[in-house]
Amino acid sequence: VAPMATASTTDKTGAPTTVTAEPGRFTIAVDGKTVGLIDYIDQGGRRIFPHTEVQPEYGGRGLATILVAEALDATRAAGLRIVPECSMVSGYIAKHPEYAPLVDRA
C-alpha cells in the first residue's frame, strides 16, 4: 500500500526525519530507516490512538513528539475527533492545549 502523506523535519540531533501516514498508523524514519510508529483506529468520526513506540536506541531525540504532533495535525485536518488511549498522546495534548477541544474520551 502506498503511503498517504509524508512530512519531513529534523530531530534533536539534527538528523533528517520523515513521518509517513499509512492505513492504520503513522511511521517515523530517521535517515530513511523506520524507527517508530503510532497506531490508530478510525471509528465513527473519531481516531483512537492506542499505542506509540520508538525503538529504544532512538529514545531521547524527540521522535515520539514529532510523530504525535504530525498524527494529531493530520487527524485535525481530516475533521476527526481524537481519542488518546496512549499515554504519550495524552501527555502531548496536556502540553499542547490547542488540541484539547478535539479530544473525546474512550
Model-derived segments and their meaning:
Residues V1-P3:
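Short, Lys/Arg-enriched N-terminal segments with co-localized hydrophobic residues
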Residues A5-R47:
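N-terminal first-folded block
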Residues G24, T34, G45, V54, ...:
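A generic "binding-loop/recognition-motif" signal
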Residues F49-H51, V68-A69:
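A short alpha-helix capping/helix-coil boundary motif
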Residues T52-G59:
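A short, internal acetyl-CoA/4′-phosphopantetheine-binding micro-motif in the GNAT/acyltransferase core
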Residues G60-A71:
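Conserved acetyl-CoA-binding loop-helix of GNAT-fold acetyltransferases
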Residues D73-A106:
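C-terminal structural segments of small proteins and small subunits
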